[in-house]
A protein has these predicted regions:
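N-terminal Sec signal peptide and the immediately downstream disordered periplasmic leader
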Residues: 1-68, 75, 80, 192, ...
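Periplasmic-side early beta-strands and strand-to-turn transitions of outer-membrane beta-barrels
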Residues: 149, 162, 170-174, 178, ...
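Outer-membrane beta-barrel signature, preferentially recognizing the C-terminal barrel domain
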Residues: 272, 281-295, 299-303, 356, ...
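Extracytoplasmic beta-strand/coil segments of soluble accessory domains associated
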Residues: 74, 78-114
């Protein structure tokens, strides 16, 4: 272990040394410098070169997505962004950990708009939402690391992921097929191009998820079907403005089961805990999950020499339902205790359900005013109204009523909250300096007001060497669930949990800063950034004993503090126009300072090595060979045992694309080639995919 630790330190030190010395060598030899320009809009809500903006920003282009053979947005992030991902325990989805900040602290947007999801207390909505976005409709993904609450408000404590969909460009019809070790998909993309004053894009994706069940699991993974439809219509008022209307629809129906029923040993305990009986029983378990999302909106967009503005209104609706049904099919009770055993066994006949919805309405307006060639001011305001309704709120909301299903009765209610906000940002260029201060004021009907300041600075020492620094406050408002939950449900067969909200919760807060350097040296490029996050008022569920039904009772409270700091490093080299090598690293120290423990589901050192080949020919090849190294990953067992349980692993992956001609390509990938499995690290083994795409 000590040798491994020393080796990792040496590797990181070597990367830093090469980065620093590489800049000196490049200046001395005056090698040709490759351009890495990319225009981004998320970091400042204005168009800027990615090298110019102070915030640490990364872009995943459509070319990156195709070259890597990505089959989902999550898949693309795992290959090209230094974002740590791990499976959620409940219902699928994947954690999105930016700079050590957990899933609920990252804001996921589509075209700069929020999307409704499970409104879950622990970020399950974010974890699931990436898999609901049609990867074939994605133009690029912009990732901003560090607090962005000064522009985007709540949830942007850790950063922002903005998925930007394909704009209308030219008359096109695309179709494709994908088959993976987990599912099969068929998709279409149509673009009318501009016809008079109109243009339109249409997308459809159909997905069938295979049934699978791990050998150690007691229940299968969810399986079933999903479908996605996207439509976007532009009307060009004149050469300087246009109106956009869009519609997105997503529907998914899944099932779960416990496999073929067999007689298995079982131990039953009386409610008093004074008697236990051992025998055998045959149980059958089934479940279902249904999700439906609808997004609608309209915006008026304009751009002149002085102004770049947008006014928009949109609505996002999300419905989800779950059921869980366990039946006793037979038993072999202990001799002489048949009556008591069968009485206790009948309590295993259970049915549970939950039906919920999360609706969001928003109105936004912003304008960027160019004062002169070196000064731009951006200001905006928004109003958001949210309604959460269903059995998840139980009796804690308004309009309480009962719902009975299959003999089980639950309470259901609803809660409506609203917020308004205004923000101001200044972009100032002064010589080699680019300074961006910003401030935002939010007022929420549940917790009151919050102000979020931020300042970012870029110093362009030369055309190919920059120093960047940022400081900002972030916050995460309590979710409706955390405020008003009254959710009593079966989480795993026979494990009943009763989660209750707390209307007195305060927003989670953070103070963060970072300092970094970026450079291009000859054919190489690199960056090194130190970041430090001090997080307060973290909300977590606290055990409160048992409820009146004997179920485990939990209540949400502001109890924890955390300190998350580390180093990010990117180092790359382009050997020529076709071959590139790149390594990204995050060295992380993430502590729950209240408990004095490591934060779980994070690695001490996470690295991704990539060797990228692309001949850029209409009838050519592209390939990516990459390796993911996670060193001292803190498993979920850390909290169960009271001590940190850490594991290290390395995953090798490969993708290959063949461009048959300028209109057709075939592609495939294998991830976790050596089929590593570890339930503690959420490693499920090898994943493979093959696909075909054709342009008519």
């Amino acid at each position: 272990m000590n040798n491994t630790k020393t080796a990792q330190r040496k590797a990181l030190l070597a990367a830093i040394t090469v980065f620093v010395m590489g800049g000196v060598t490049a200046q001395a030899e005056e090698l040709p410098v490759y351009s890495f320009d990319e225009v981004v809009v998320t970091a400042t809500r204005t168009e800027n070169d990615v090298k110019k903006v102070p915030a640490s920003t990364q872009v995943i282009t459509q070319e990156d997505i195709k070259r890597g053979g990505a089959t989902s947005v999550r898949n693309a992030l795992s290959m090209y962004a230094n974002i740590f991902q791990k499976s959620k325990v409940r219902g699928g989805g994947h954690d999105i950990i930016i700079r050590g900040m957990e899933t609920k602290h990252s804001l996921v947007m589509v075209n700069g708009r929020r999307i409704s999801n499970e409104a879950d207390a622990n970020g399950l909505g974010n974890a699931m939402s990436l898999d609901r976005i049609n990867i074939n409709d994605v133009e690029k993904i912009e990732i901003v690391r560090g607090p962005s609450s000064a522009l985007y408000g709540s949830e942007a404590m850790g950063g922002v992921l903005n998925i930007i969909t394909k704009p209308s460009k030219e008359q096109t019809l695309l179709t494709g097929l994908e088959h993976t070790s987990e599912d099969t998909s068929h998709w279409w993309h149509a673009d009318t191009g501009r016809i008079g004053n109109f243009s339109m894009t249409l997308d459809a994706r159909f997905n069938k998820i295979n049934r699978s069940m791990l050998e150690t699991a007691t229940e299968s993974d969810p399986y079933g079907t999903a479908q996605t439809y996207n439509a976007s219509l532009n009307y060009y008022v004149n050469d300087h403005s246009y109106v956009n209307a869009y519609m997105d629809y997503y529907s998914q129906h899944l099932k779960t089961d416990t496999g073929t029923p067999t007689m298995k040993p079982i131990t039953l305990t009386t409610s008093s805990g004074k008697m236990s009986l051992s025998g055998q029983a045959m149980l059958e378990g089934t479940g279902s999950k249904a999700y439906k999302q609808k997004n609608y909106g309209i915006s008026w967009n304009g751009k002149t020499d002085k102004n770049d503005w947008q006014i928009q209104a949109y609505m996002s609706k999300f419905n989800w339902s779950t059921t869980s049904n366990t039946k006793v099919l037979g038993s072999i009770p202990p001799a002489g205790m048949e009556g008591m055993f069968n009485y206790l066994l009948q309590k295993k006949n259970t049915y549970d359900f939950n039906h919920d919805e999360h609706n969001m309405w928003a109105i936004e307006g912003r304008d960027s005013l160019r004062v002169n060639d070196h000064h731009r001011v951006t200001f905006g305001a928004e109003y958001v109204k949210e309604k959460v309704a269903g059995t998840g709120l139980g009796k804690n909301g308004d309009g309480v009523h009962s719902i009975t299903e299959n003999g089980t009765t639950k309470s259901s209610s609803e809660k409506t909250l609203s917020s308004y906000a205004a923000y101001l940002q200044d972009e100032i260029e002064y010589g080699k300096w680019f300074i961006v201060p910003a401030i935002r004021y939010d007022h929420h009907s549940a917790y009151g007001s919050h102000t979020s300041p931020k300042i970012g600075v870029t110093y362009n020492a030369t055309d190919h060497f920059r120093i960047k620094a940022n400081y900002g406050d972030g916050f995460k408002a309590p979710s409706v669930s955390q405020l008003y939950y009254d959710l009593d449900m079966e989480m795993g067969r026979g494990n009943w949990v009763h989660l209750t909200g707390n209307p007195n919760l305060k927003p989670e807060k953070s103070k963060s800063w970072d300092l970094g350097v970026e450079a291009e040296f000859g054919k190489g490029y690199g960056s090194l950034t130190y970041f430090d996050n001090d997080v307060d008022n973290l909300i977590t569920s606290i055990p409160k004993g048992k409820d009146s039904n004997g179920h485990n009772l939990h209540r949400y409270e502001n109890v924890n503090k955390a300190r998350i700091k580390g180093l990010e490093n990117t180092l790359g080299y382009r050997f020529n126009d076709t071959l590139e090598f790149k390594v990204t690293s995050t060295l992380l120290d993430a502590k729950d300072t209240s408990a004095g423990k490591d934060l779980t589901q994070r690695a001490r050192l996470s690295q991704i090595y990539q060797l990228i080949y692309d001949d850029h020919k209409d009838t050519g090849w592209s390939a990516v060979l990459w390796n993911q190294l996670d060193y001292k990953f803190v498993t979920g067992k850390a909290w169960e045992s009271g001590e940190s349980v850490k594991k290290s692993y390395s995953l090798t992956n490969f993708s290959l694309t063949r461009k048959v001609n300028k209109d057709t390509r075939v592609y495939g990938s294998v991830q976790n080639i050596f089929d590593k499995k570890d339930a503690d690290c959420d490693l499920d083994g090898r994943f493979w995919s093959i696909g075909w795409e054709h342009k008519f």
